[in-house]
Amino acid sequence: PIFAQAADKELSYVGYEQVPANAQALLIAKNSTIDSIQDLKGKRIAVQRGSSAHELLAKVLQKAGLSWQDIQPIWLPPADARAAFDKQSIDAWAIWEPYLSAAEQDAHAKVLIDGTAFPQTYSFYIGNPKFIQAYPEATAQFIHGLNQADQWVLKNQPQALSVYTQSTGLQPSIAQRVIDKRLKPSPIQTLTPEVVQAQQQIADLFQQVQLIPKHIQVQSTVWVAPSKP
């Protein structure tokens, strides 16, 4: 959402979900000579522009005391990044689930660092402001439906695994790893001041390292749910 807002796209944050800390990571090959995040200097790192992994990589570089000029970012979507990773034409890959578990199981990838090093990681649900303004009750029902689905997953683990496997085409063992990482429960809620502040800090970091061209105010795009009668 940060990149879209910085590009003046119309959007509204309608909800958020806590992301499991180990659901995204920076991967290296099993035979990699990279031992620490400081060793990323000069390395080719694949990441999808504007994704949560883009955010993760920005935080990793900051933690390592490196800049974007210190690395060679390779902008690739997950499928292309996986192919490059398998051919070892990249040195590291910033990625999220289920691609993370698939690479760990099939390519024996190693985790250099994951989200456990960075608290306050969230996944967001975004809506069209015009639709939300016209149909606020429908937006609230959408969030309610997601939470009903979350409760169903909790109570029907075998069926949830079957549905997830069939809908994604993942191997059952990989799908199970992804589900096992999932927070239980994993409620979707409207944004709290703490979540807005955390997202604002990321936006400020992105501006500081010139990943976005200007300052943005996250709060200005946050949807407020209608009050219950």
Which functions belong to the PLM regions below?
Residues 1-67, 72-75, 91-97, 110, ...:
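Short, glycine-/small- and polar/acidic-enriched structural segments
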Residues 9, 66, 170, 211-212:
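Helix N-cap/coil-helix junction residues
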Residues 5, 62, 105, 166, ...:
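Short polybasic/polar patches that bind polyanions
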Residues 74, 79-166:
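Pocket-lining segment of extracytoplasmic ligand-binding domains
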Residues 134-211:
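Secondary-structure end/capping motifs
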